[in-house]
A protein has these predicted regions:
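Amphipathic alpha-helical repeat scaffolds
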Residues: 12-16
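A solvent-exposed, acidic/Ser-Thr-rich amphipathic alpha-helical stretch
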Residues: 4-5, 17, 23-79, 89, ...
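Generic short beta-strand segments
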Residues: 88-95
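A generic "structured core" feature
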Residues: 21-23, 110, 141-142
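Basic/polar N-terminal segments that are highly enriched at the extreme N-terminus
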Residues: 1-5, 139-142
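Hydrophobic alpha-helical segments of small multi-pass membrane proteins
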Residues: 75, 92, 108-112
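Short beta-strand edge/turn micro-motifs at domain boundaries
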Residues: 85, 105-136
Length: 142
């Protein structure tokens, strides 16, 4: 796929499969190189390199069942040369971990794609759940 928007559409479809526990479609969109990265709540610190990213994607996808990534809202995009970064809000609903009921949640996500020959490949994803502000949390001024 050489059209960036087409690749992003495939990426969103792959995330829908991810929400059902199948990480393979997302893995297929990644560049399988030593410089790729992934940061998500299941792996703690960001991981670097294809082998570790693939393992982290397997771990993360194994935590989801019976889910959907129902909506993505693009907040911003930055495209230049052979790199493109999108910032999105993703609306998910899934059974997570041992939970027996599917719950909705919102992720804030930054994804970077790189043009590899004539195809765009993912090289970075950082996803965090958005939670309610905690006035007593560690990042609040006193």
């Amino acid at each position: 796929m050489n059209d960036l928007e087409e690749v992003i559409g495939s990426y969103h479809q792959a995330l829908d499969q991810f929400a059902r526990g199948d990480g393979e479609p997302v893995k297929a969109l990644y560049a399988h190189t030593d410089d790729v990265t992934l940061a998500n709540p299941f792996v703690g610190l960001p991981v670097h390199g294809w082998t570790r990213v693939a393992e982290a994607l397997d771990l993360a996808s194994s935590n989801f069942r019976d889910g959907v990534m129902s909506r993505s809202d693009r907040v911003a995009q930055y495209i230049g040369g052979d790199l493109a970064t999108i910032v999105e809000l993703e609306q998910w609903q899934a059974k997570v971990g041992d939970r027996q009921e599917a719950k909705p949640f919102l992720l804030r996500v930054t994804t970077t794609f790189r043009l590899d020959g004539d195809s765009w490949k993912m090289v970075h994803r950082h996803a965090d759940p958005i939670s309610s502000p905690n006035p007593d949390g560690p990042l609040r001024a006193s």
